[in-house]
């Protein structure tokens, strides 16, 4: 009986520590989801504003090219649909999100278009991406006590954005900016989806369907 009483304080402390860790985890998830939602909305607005500067024929042509082309980050293997996203583990979703955010650290600094909104928000975007990357890394470290299971994809190196479309003709800058903004919007939507599903899983909610 005496041993039971001695163990009770230890169990209570362990329980409180576990609850504290869970609350901190949810706090980090809330911050990460809020930040990527803001980035996604900002990306959507910048893309729409840029499209607004183009003629109708230009928009249609660029959209056709974009649908046939690919984003720099497409080399990062990620779920192809909602079903695959739902089946992916929390750690896998976090790792993919980390790689997607990491892939935009450099191009977010090199986007130079006449759109005044983009010029005004370029530094803000870079800072938010860096903060989000740090936050996701903390979530990854807490998912398996810092022991990561790296996929083969994590060792891949993305082609540099510095040489992106360097051989295009006179309209190259317009096409480059269109595709960069479209890809940025697409990738932020991906990360928002992955982090939202991961957050739901960690909160033990009954329904985490998209």
Curated annotation (Swiss-Prot):
Residues annotated as binding Zn(2+): 38, 192
Domain of life according to the entry: Eukaryota
GO biological process: animal organ development; calcium ion homeostasis; growth hormone receptor signaling pathway; hyperosmotic salinity response; magnesium ion homeostasis; positive regulation of growth; positive regulation of phagocytosis; positive regulation of receptor signaling pathway via JAK-STAT
Subcellular location: Secreted
Main location group: secreted
Keywords annotated in UniProt: Disulfide bond, Hormone, Metal-binding, Secreted, Signal, Zinc
Any one GO cellular component localisation term in the record: extracellular space
Secretion signal, residue range per the UniProt entry: 1-22
Entry-linked InterPro entries: 4_helix_cytokine-like_core, Somatotropin, Somatotropin/Prolactin, Somatotropin_CS
Disulfide cross-links: 71-183, 200-208
Record keyword Manganese present: no
Gene Ontology molecular function, alphabetical: growth hormone activity; growth hormone receptor binding; metal ion binding
The keyword Transport belongs to this UniProt entry's keyword annotation: no
PANTHER family recorded: SOMATOTROPIN, SOMATOTROPIN,PROLACTIN
Family label: Belongs to the somatotropin/prolactin family.
Known role: Growth hormone plays an important role in growth control and is involved in the regulation of several anabolic processes. Implicated as an osmoregulatory substance important for seawater adaptation.
Protein name in the entry: Somatotropin-2
Native source species: Oncorhynchus nerka
Gene (name only): gh2
């Amino acid at each position: 009986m005496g041993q039971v009483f001695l163990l009770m304080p230890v169990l209570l402390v362990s329980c409180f520590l576990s609850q504290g860790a869970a609350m901190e985890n949810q706090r980090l998830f809330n911050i990460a989801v809020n930040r990527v939602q803001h980035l996604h909305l900002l990306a959507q607005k910048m893309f729409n504003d840029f499209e607004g500067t183009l003629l109708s024929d230009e928009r249609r042509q660029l959209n056709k090219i974009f649908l046939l082309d690919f984003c720099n980050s497409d080399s990062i293997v990620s779920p192809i649909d909602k079903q695959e996203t739902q089946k992916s583990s929390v750690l896998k979703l976090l790792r993919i999100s980390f790689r997607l955010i990491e892939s935009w650290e450099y191009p977010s600094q090199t986007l130079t278009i006449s759109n005044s909104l983009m010029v005004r928000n370029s530094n803000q975007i870079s800072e938010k991406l860096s903060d989000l990357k740090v936050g996701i890394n903390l979530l990854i470290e807490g998912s398996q006590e810092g022991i990561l299971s790296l996929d083969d994809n994590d060792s891949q190196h993305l082609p540099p954005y510095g040489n992106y479309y360097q051989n295009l003709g006179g309209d190259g800058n317009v096409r480059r900016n269109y595709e960069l903004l479209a890809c940025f919007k697409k990738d932020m939507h991906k990360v928002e989806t992955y982090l939202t599903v991961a957050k739901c899983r960690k909160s033990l909610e009954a329904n985490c369907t998209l």
